[in-house]
Regions:
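C-terminal motif of bacterial Sec signal peptides marking the signal peptidase cleavage site
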Residues: 17-20
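Structural motif
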Residues: 38-48, 232-240
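Activation corresponds to long, low-complexity, non-globular regions
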Residues: 137-243, 247, 310-375
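Bacterial signal peptide processing site
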Residues: 22-24
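Low-complexity, Pro/Ser/Thr- and charge-rich linker/hinge segments at domain boundaries
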Residues: 115-155, 296-313
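Edge beta-strands of extracellular beta-sandwich domains
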Residues: 108-114, 283-293
Length: 375
């Protein structure tokens, strides 16, 4: 009886392995996937899109239906889907046509760009590879076009719990256009492009524009990548990291969980980290928000030395009682500390798990987290 049971288990295991291998093989040869197209722009630098199309296949076009965009770089909201997300899907994006008005610059930009073979191959490869999310294989579902000041265009593949920047080198052309040609209804509101743009900015955006202008070089900083790892070190040896709840949000808009199985190369500067860790039956959840200027300066200094080709470490050291934090970048023998990070830590124990408030530690006044200028 045991022998027959063992044979049955081996057969079942072999069957699962064959199915898994076939699924992997099918994915690696697949050239169509379900995806939708969307557009976004930095929160402080909104745009209005006259038209947008993502080309795919043999001259086919996927329309971008959103007209107003400022959800933030790398962030997709409110996309309209024409794809069957459970079906065969669409061929890979291979072209972009878009015309938009930048409210903060009072400028029109136009692009009609055929993607290089290299970019198309990268997009296909990412779809074929997918990623892991809490032990479940996921795939990207959104092709996101991010429109930046100066006519820069960044392209992302977004999915559940992962945003990947696939191209940050596309450039649109500034063009002259009459307001009525852009949108005839706009003339019912204002007679000039300048007045129309001013009227479409909210109070926050107006205040930011007055203080910071349009810092074109800032997005060049956001693009930069560095050779480093992100690590947590605990003074209490009993602390155990919950690898399924270790999330990283970067200054270039990328977002991922540490356990997603995607090979890590060079990284953008960190913007925010989220981590759960356990000590016996107590669970801590930490949210770490880094100051924009500090992070910009830290990495510029840290990787300016001769040791810049050495892999660095962005370290968060946690005290024995989980209420003190040292955060620094180490490259070779050099350490650069962050002093202005905003930190929240929540603590859940068997005794307080039914309580509404689990806030255990915070180091700043009020509830407002500082926002990045160009994000």
């Amino acid at each position: 009886m045991k022998k027959h049971l063992l044979v049955g288990l081996l057969a079942a295991t072999l069957c699962v392995m064959v199915i898994a291998c076939n699924n992997k093989q099918d994915m690696s040869t697949r050239t169509k996937f379900p995806w939708v197209a969307n557009v976004t722009a930095p929160r402080n630098y909104p745009v209005e899109v006259k038209y947008g199309f993502v080309g795919f296949g043999q001259g086919q076009k996927y329309p971008i239906m959103s007209s107003f965009a400022n959800a933030g770089i790398g962030i997709s909201k409110g996309e309209v889907s024409f794809a069957d997300l459970d079906g065969e899907g669409l061929a890979m994006p291979n072209r972009l046509e878009v015309l938009w008005l930048s409210y903060t610059e009072r400028k029109f930009y136009k692009a009609d760009i055929a993607f290089s073979e290299k970019l198309q191959a990268r997009i296909l490869s990412l779809f074929q590879e997918g990623y892991e999310n809490e032990q479940k294989h996921e795939n990207y579902s959104c092709f996101l076009v991010t429109l930046l000041p100066g006519g820069k265009i960044w392209l992302y593949l977004n999915g559940i719990a992962r945003y990947s920047l696939v191209c940050d080198t596309l450039q649109a052309d500034a063009i002259d256009m009459a307001l009525g040609d852009f949108d005839k209804d706009a003339l019912l509101v204002d007679s000039t492009v300048e007045d129309y743009c001013k009227g479409n900015l909210n109070k926050e955006q107006v205040a930011n524009l007055k203080e910071n202008g349009v810092p074109y070089e800032l997005w060049s900083k956001y693009q930069e990548r560095f050779n480093y790892d992100i690590e947590f070190e605990f003074e209490d040896n009993l602390c155990k990291i919950d690898s399924f709840h270790f999330a990283k949000h970067f200054i270039n808009g990328e977002f991922n969980y540490a356990c997603d199985g995607v090979k890590v190369g060079e990284l953008s500067r960190p913007k925010q980290l989220y981590l759960k860790w356990n000590v016996a039956d107590t669970t801590y959840t930490g949210e770490f928000f880094f100051d924009e200027q500090e992070v910009l300066d830290m990495f510029s200094k840290g990787f300016s030395h001769k040791t810049a080709n050495v892999r660095g470490t962005f370290m968060v050291k946690v005290s024995k009682y989980n209420n003190r934090f040292d955060i620094y970048l180490q490259v070779g023998d050099y350490k650069y500390y962050l002093k202005n990070s905003q930190i929240d830590v929540f603590k859940v124990t068997p005794e307080n798990e039914k309580d509404n408030d689990h806030l255990f530690y915070w180091n700043y006044e009020g509830e407002e987290v500082r926002k990045y200028i160009g994000a």
